[in-house]
């Protein structure tokens, strides 16, 4: 299970260093193989390959009225491998789609990660906090 937020920088080649606390898990779970794809909220999804295979199967099984979503998730997917330094190369097309420039946020979301442009994430988080808790969390005890 992946959790936590990490402020990271992309290098000049568009590579992102996976934090050391997640590298070992990605090596054990997926031998360093991950898949990146677009997310409709404007970020990227980063899956360990076994989790991606499960997600891909679920997306492929969607009915025809969701065909564009199949294109978005599956048609933009990029399989990559962590290099020896624990970096993942984010393709230029995916960097552009998520408006990733230099500063990014990597968010552990349980079975996968989200990769956000840092400024976009900060603005969306602030907006969500200003709107207050959604109904689904009203009775949630902390």
Curated annotation (Swiss-Prot):
Q: Which cysteines are joined by disulfide bonds?
A: none
Subcellular location(s) of the protein: Cytoplasm, Nucleoid
Q: List, in alphabetical order, the Gene Ontology terms for molecular function in this entry.
A: DNA-binding transcription factor activity; transcription cis-regulatory region binding
**Which GO biological process annotations does it have?**
negative regulation of DNA-templated transcription initiation
Recorded coiled-coil stretches: none
Task: Give the source's domain of life in one word.
Answer: Bacteria
Q: Which GO terms describe its cellular component?
A: cytoplasm; nucleoid
Query: Sorted alphabetically, which keywords does the UniProt record give?
Result: Cytoplasm, DNA-binding, Repeat, Transcription, Transcription regulation
The residue ranges of the SpoVT-AbrB domain are: 5-51, 77-120
Subunit and partners: Forms oligomers.
* Record-stated family: Belongs to the MraZ family.
UniProt protein name: Transcriptional regulator MraZ
Q: Which organism is it from?
A: Cupriavidus taiwanensis (strain DSM 17343 / BCRC 17206 / CCUG 44338 / CIP 107171 / LMG 19424 / R1) (Ralstonia taiwanensis (strain LMG 19424))
């Amino acid at each position: 299970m992946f959790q936590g937020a990490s402020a990271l920088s992309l290098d000049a080649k568009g590579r992102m260093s996976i934090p050391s606390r997640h590298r070992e898990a990605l090596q054990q779970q997926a031998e360093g193989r991950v898949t990146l794809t677009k997310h409709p909220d404007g970020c990227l999804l980063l899956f360990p390959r076994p989790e991606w295979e499960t997600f891909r199967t679920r997306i492929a099984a969607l009915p025809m009225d969701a065909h564009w979503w199949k294109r978005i998730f599956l048609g933009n997917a990029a399989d990559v491998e962590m290099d020896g330094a624990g970096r993942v190369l984010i393709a230029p097309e995916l960097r552009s789609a998520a408006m990733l420039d230099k500063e990014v946020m990597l968010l552990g979301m349980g079975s996968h990660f989200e990769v956000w442009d840092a400024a976009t994430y900060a603005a969306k988080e602030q907006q969500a906090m200003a709107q207050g808790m959604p109904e689904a969390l009203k009775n949630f005890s902390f």
